[in-house]
């Protein structure tokens, strides 16, 4: 009997491993949220994070299909587009396929800082991507985006970015590591972050096995403090291990309405 249960356990473990490697990492979940804000008209945001991509593969193809279905006004990427060991040229085919009427906007993650590149603005500009590094720019006249360096591996300068924002406009903060929200809360109505992968590998009734540094106590989804809201994306890709279990990749659609 004991041998029988060991065999059943081994088969279940192999099945879970196969699911985590070959199935779940490609089952991108689209989440929808509507929030109120002082905007002139609704703004539909596609929030992406942690693509960890090196080619247009199965997961990237599915992401592009979903973006085409959702038709967001703007795409905001909160860092970690690449994966360790891959250079920037290999993510060009992925990033060049991202399009939205109000543009694609990107901030650094820890992988970008650990793989430094000269002339980042020029590189992303040729892909029609707006790269923000401790600076702000208008998505449209009534909505500005302030993009920060990665808090976990760089030098974010919140004051420098927000000083560029004119008074009276709706401001979105974008940064990679969500632990920075403890400093940023109260400075803008909405913040977007990633970095955590939602835990990436999770089991029922057990705490999260691993979170990267500077995640704070933030895992995934919505958080609030001092009048600000933050959304933490589970991300698209994987890192360290090519596995997701009970933690599907995510395309977050956030609509801000008046």
Where are these regions (language model features)?
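Membrane-embedded segments
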Residues: 39-135
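Mobile, glycine- and charge-enriched loop segments
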Residues: 23-57, 164-169, 178
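Binuclear metal-dependent hydrolase catalytic cores centered on His/Asp/Glu-rich metal-binding motifs
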Residues: 113, 119-129, 133-136, 140-175, ...
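Conserved acidic residues
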Residues: 73-75, 102, 169-172, 189
């Amino acid at each position: 009997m004991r041998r029988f249960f060991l065999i059943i356990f081994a088969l279940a473990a192999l099945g879970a491993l196969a699911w985590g490697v070959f199935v779940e990492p490609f089952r991108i979940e689209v989440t929808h949220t509507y929030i109120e804000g002082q905007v002139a008209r609704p703004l539909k945001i596609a929030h992406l994070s942690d693509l960890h991509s090196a080619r247009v593969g199965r997961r990237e193809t599915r992401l592009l299909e979903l973006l085409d279905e959702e038709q967001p006004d703007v795409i905001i990427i909160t860092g970690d587009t690449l994966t360790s060991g891959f250079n920037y040229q290999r993510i060009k085919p992925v990033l060049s396929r991202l399009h939205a009427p109000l543009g694609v906007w990107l901030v650094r993650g820890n992988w970008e800082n650990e793989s430094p590149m000269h002339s980042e603005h020029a590189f992303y500009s040729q892909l029609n991507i707006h790269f923000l590094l401790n600076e702000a720019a208008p998505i449209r006249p009534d909505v500005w985006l302030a993009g920060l360096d990665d808090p976990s591996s760089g030098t974010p300068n919140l004051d420098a970015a927000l000083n560029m924002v004119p008074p009276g406009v709706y401001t979105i903060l974008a940064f990679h590591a969500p632990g920075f929200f403890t400093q940023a809360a109260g400075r803008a109505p909405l913040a977007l972050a990633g970095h955590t992968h939602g835990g990436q590998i999770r089991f029922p009734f057990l705490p999260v096995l691993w979170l990267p540094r500077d995640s704070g106590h933030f895992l995934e989804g919505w958080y609030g403090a001092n009048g600000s809201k933050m959304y933490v994306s589970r991300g698209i890709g994987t890192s360290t291990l090519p596995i997701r279990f009970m933690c599907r990749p995510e395309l977050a659609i956030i609509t801000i309405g008046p």
